């Protein structure tokens, strides 16, 4: 296939485009981006047919900061006939065999979502036709490729596939999380999504277990603390502002009225450090580096607020500097990952795991 289709948050197309251009160049794949502001997606069109398949396989989705989901796609299908939109789509997928799932989607914009009812109606007859053609298995198979049909306008769609081991498990790359009625703020969904995204389901029981000690810097009113408490952890909540009373009543939270940048934990056996402070991203990164160098935590999740321009460049520079600082201070065994999550706005979420080679214990 010739195109790589990348879903992103509307307004972040330039950042998504800058990132995929760099990553494709690293693999010596030539091409150019096609996108419009607030479309909610980016097209990377390769110069060589087949290069999109290579990108879809060799670029890890989780390594892309601003991409929620991606798939290798054919040329844009235009003016699909109202009487039969199924046949042209099936024909365009002639080279796809024995896929395990079909997703008929739209970009995450209000305009595109107006097509969602149509997409639902199309899914059943399209699924049946793809099964008859051999492009889709009779039963869903999570180990086989996923067929994507993304309508970007009425009668206009990109069609292609993603590989199941390098694809978001969620429709449109968006996890559907419920806001708990007793959570102090909607920011709680950011940490909930971060845990789901960065911690494999098979390891969550060990790495997010009850009884762990944690610290929340900039905790007020307690949106992130709520997620730690919900998982049975003990939390040192650091903020000059007030904490939600229902969290304090659990007996799991100790509130330190202090500046998060000056706080030193009285106990150093901290597994989780979390931080969502409205501050310059470089300053937050430096704080996380200091805690890591002091060995005060095992895993951290923190948000970096983004500038208005050159967001990909800024984040890349901060992450590269962080890796350099850690290594200069003798910390070579670490895992660093970053994602613009669905519940993030003008920010990205970073996960830092120290000494992953020793597993889930301090070492």
Curated annotation (Swiss-Prot):
Protein task: Catalyzes the 2'-O-methylation at nucleotide C2498 in 23S rRNA.
Swiss-Prot/TrEMBL keywords: Cytoplasm, Methyltransferase, rRNA processing, S-adenosyl-L-methionine, Transferase
Gene Ontology biological process terms in this record: methylation; rRNA processing
HAMAP family for the chain: 23SrRNA_methyltr_M
One protein family per Pfam: FtsJ
GO molecular function list: S-adenosylmethionine-dependent methyltransferase activity
Subunit structure: Monomer.
NCBIfam families: PRK11760.1
Protein name: Ribosomal RNA large subunit methyltransferase M
Broad EC category: transferase
Compartments (UniProt record): Cytoplasm
Bilayer-spanning residue ranges: none
Organism: Shewanella loihica (strain ATCC BAA-1088 / PV-4)
């Amino acid at each position: 296939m010739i195109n790589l289709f990348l879903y992103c948050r509307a307004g972040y197309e330039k950042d998504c485009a800058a990132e995929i251009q760099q990553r494709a160049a690293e693999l010596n794949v030539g091409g150019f981006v096609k996108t419009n502001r607030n479309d909610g997606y980016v097209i990377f069109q390769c110069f060589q047919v087949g290069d999109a398949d290579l990108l879809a396989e060799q670029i890890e989705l989780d390594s892309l900061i601003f991409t929620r989901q991606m798939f290798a796609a054919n040329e844009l299908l235009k003016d699909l006939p109202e009487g039969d939109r199924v046949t042209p789509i099936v024909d365009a997928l002639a080279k796809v065999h024995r896929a395990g799932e079909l997703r008929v989607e739209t970009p995450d914009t209000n305009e595109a979502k107006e097509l969602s009812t149509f997409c639902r109606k199309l899914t059943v007859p399209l699924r049946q036709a793809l099964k008859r053609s051999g492009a889709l298995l009779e039963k869903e198979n999570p180990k086989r490729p996923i067929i994507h049909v993304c309508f970007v306008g009425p009668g206009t769609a990109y069609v292609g596939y993603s590989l199941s081991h390098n694809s978001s498990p969620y429709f449109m790359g968006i996890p559907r999380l419920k806001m708990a009625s007793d959570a102090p703020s909607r920011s709680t969904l950011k940490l909930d999504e971060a845990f789901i995204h960065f911690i494999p389901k098979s390891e969550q029981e060990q790495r997010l277990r009850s009884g762990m000690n944690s610290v929340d810097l900039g905790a007020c009113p307690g949106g992130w603390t709520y997620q730690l408490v919900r998982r049975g952890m003990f939390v040192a909540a650091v903020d000059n502002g007030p904490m939600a009373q229902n969290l304090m009543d659990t007996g799991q939270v100790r509130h330190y009225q202090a500046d998060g940048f000056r706080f030193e934990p009285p106990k150093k056996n901290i597994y989780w450090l979390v931080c969502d402070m409205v501050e310059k991203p470089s300053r937050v990164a430096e704080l996380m580096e200091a805690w890591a160098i002091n060995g005060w935590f095992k895993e951290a999740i923190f948000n970096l607020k983004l500038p208005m321009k050159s967001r990909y460049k800024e984040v890349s520079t901060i992450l590269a500097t962080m890796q350099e600082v850690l290594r200069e201070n003798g910390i070579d065994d670490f895992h660093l990952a970053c994602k613009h999550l669905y519940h993030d706005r003008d920010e990205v979420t970073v996960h830092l795991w120290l000494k992953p080679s020793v597993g889930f214990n301090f070492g």
